[in-house]
Amino acid sequence: MKGISRMSIREVSEVLNTEPSEEFLKACAQDERLGIQNLIVRYYKEWEARLVEAERIEALLREEKQLWLNGYLHIAGIDEAGRGPLAGPVVAATCILPAKFNLPGLNDSKKLTESKREKLFQQIKEQAIGYAVGSAEPAEIDGLNILQATKLAMKRAVEGLKVRPHFLLIDALELPSLKIPQKGIIDGDALSASIAAASILAKVSRDHLMGELDKLYPEYGFAKNKGYGTREHLMALRRCGVSPIHRRSFAPVQQQLDIV
């Protein structure tokens, strides 16, 4: 490589985007060109951000690492999406992550933008040892109650795995019907990488489904509100009545049925 003084700013930038040596970084720091100084400042800011992110991901793996040490190889994180909406199914997902993965930004799905969730959704599916999605339909929610329907969706997700899980990490709940060692973790989607990954799979899968249901029932705006009781959704409910995918046991829907 030629000396840095003979390199253009563009050439220096290209080297900094690889894995520059300490010698190269020192040379950049000593270069008096303003463009090079800006590049080196940006490089170290990005390096520090990557370090902080690596430490955050490491903290998210605390539960998994302890379980791996105890001999549990396949740890399945489980989470749900859609307990609160007035329409559509409750969807659960389970995900078994490898010990080494590259999912920058992995977090509780509620803390991510839609575009970031979509990107991670694809990355998780590509890198996971195993994953599956399960759901419980509105009629099942009405017949059981939302808590039991959520557990049913989670059970279906676990049963859909092609890889046998050795331990389950579940957001807030326990699934006694599954005879697999398990642990419920309050706010698990913010504390466990496996549960965070499952939360993204569940959320994005449900959002996609509500987009499809919007084509069948466009008057309710499901693609936008995902079935939640927004002002526009409630107005459509009063105007158009109850659809086949509304949860009849939920108060606003029940009130509309009582009016009819």
UniProtKB/Swiss-Prot annotation:
The lineage of its organism: Bacteria, Bacillati, Bacillota, Clostridia, Eubacteriales. Its cofactor is Mn(2+); Mg(2+). It is found in: Cytoplasm. GO terms for cellular component: cytoplasm; ribonuclease H2 complex. Gene3D superfamilies: Ribonuclease H-like superfamily/Ribonuclease H. It is an enzyme of class 3 (hydrolase). One of its GO terms (biological process) is DNA replication, removal of RNA primer. Belongs to the RNase HII family. Residues 73-260 form the RNase H type-2 domain. Endonuclease that specifically degrades the RNA of RNA-DNA hybrids. This is Ribonuclease HII.
